């Protein structure tokens, strides 16, 4: 979902309220883990997203599903927040609210988000190398990696931090070679 002005007016207060609750109870780290769990659950279960977004599914059914799926994994405050979103008919905005919360948490902890695209999953040493490179690029002490797979890269990685892009993919190198060769003609 693109964050429009209306979207921002809805998302930000909920994300800020969750952050305020986390800070006042000294649970920012725990809430961060819980939100990451929820986002992962939504990512791996499109059916869950569809049920939560469906206005024809009764709120009590949505609450029962959330209690069953997330209650054992998340803090009680986070569960109550999810149930509040159901009551307020905002549960369909769960994913963008969680992403907004993560952005607030990164700002609070001075953490930089690096979006890494590669052909295959990075190994732990490769992840650490990317983290060190991003720390050098940004001067930040903490880096959060968001990884994505793209088989069209052929090999290598693309690292995006804010507006900076470091393209060390084979596809990018081939494109640069092609541009160089076409500039000679």
UniProtKB/Swiss-Prot annotation:
UniProt keyword annotation of GTP-binding present: no
Q: Which GO terms describe its cellular component?
A: plasma membrane-derived thylakoid membrane; proton-transporting ATP synthase complex
Question: How would you describe this protein's topology in the membrane?
Answer: Peripheral membrane protein
Q: List GO molecular-function terms, semicolon-separated.
A: proton-transporting ATP synthase activity, rotational mechanism
Specify the domain of life of the species encoding this protein. Answer: Bacteria
What keywords tag this UniProt record? ATP synthesis, CF(1), Hydrogen ion transport, Ion transport, Membrane, Thylakoid, Transport
| Subcellular compartments | Cellular thylakoid membrane
What the entry lists under Gene3D superfamilies is as follows: N-terminal domain of the delta subunit of the F1F0-ATP synthase (1.10.520.20)
> What PROSITE patterns does the record point to?
ATPASE_DELTA
Similarity section: Belongs to the ATPase delta chain family.
Q: What does this protein do?
A: F(1)F(0) ATP synthase produces ATP from ADP in the presence of a proton or sodium gradient. F-type ATPases consist of two structural domains, F(1) containing the extramembraneous catalytic core and F(0) containing the membrane proton channel, linked together by a central stalk and a peripheral stalk. During catalysis, ATP synthesis in the catalytic domain of F(1) is coupled via a rotary mechanism of the central stalk subunits to proton translocation. This protein is part of the stalk that links CF(0) to CF(1). It either transmits conformational changes from CF(0) to CF(1) or is implicated in proton conduction.
Q: HAMAP family from the entry? A: ATP_synth_delta_bact (MF_01416)
How is this protein organized at the quaternary level?
A: F-type ATPases have 2 components, F(1) - the catalytic core - and F(0) - the membrane proton channel. F(1) has five subunits: alpha(3), beta(3), gamma(1), delta(1), epsilon(1). CF(0) has four main subunits: a(1), b(1), b'(1) and c(10-14). The alpha and beta chains form an alternating ring which encloses part of the gamma chain. F(1) is attached to F(0) by a central stalk formed by the gamma and epsilon chains, while a peripheral stalk is formed by the delta, b and b' chains.
Question: What is the protein name given in its UniProt record?
Answer: ATP synthase subunit delta
User: From which organism does this entry originate?
Assistant: Cyanothece sp. (strain PCC 7425 / ATCC 29141)
The gene designation is atpH
């Amino acid at each position: 979902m693109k964050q429009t002005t209306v979207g921002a007016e809805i998302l930000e207060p909920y994300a800020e309220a969750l952050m305020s609750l986390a800070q006042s109870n000294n649970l920012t780290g725990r809430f961060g883990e819980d939100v990451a769990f929820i986002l992962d659950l939504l990512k791996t279960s499109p059916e869950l997203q569809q049920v939560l977004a469906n206005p024809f599914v009764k709120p009590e059914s949505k609450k029962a599903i959330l209690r069953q799926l997330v209650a054992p994994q998340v803090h009680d405050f986070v569960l109550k927040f999810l149930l509040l979103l159901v009551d307020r008919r905002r549960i369909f905005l769960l994913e963008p609210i969680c992403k907004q919360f993560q952005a607030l948490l990164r700002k609070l902890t001075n953490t930089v988000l690096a979006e890494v695209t590669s052909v295959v999953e990075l190994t732990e040493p490769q992840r650490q190398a990317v983290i060190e490179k991003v720390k050098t690029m940004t001067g930040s002490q903490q880096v959060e990696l968001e990884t994505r797979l793209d088989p069209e890269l052929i090999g290598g990685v693309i690292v995006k931090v804010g507006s900076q892009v470091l393209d060390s993919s084979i596809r990018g190198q081939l494109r640069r070679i092609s541009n160089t060769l076409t500039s000679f003609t």
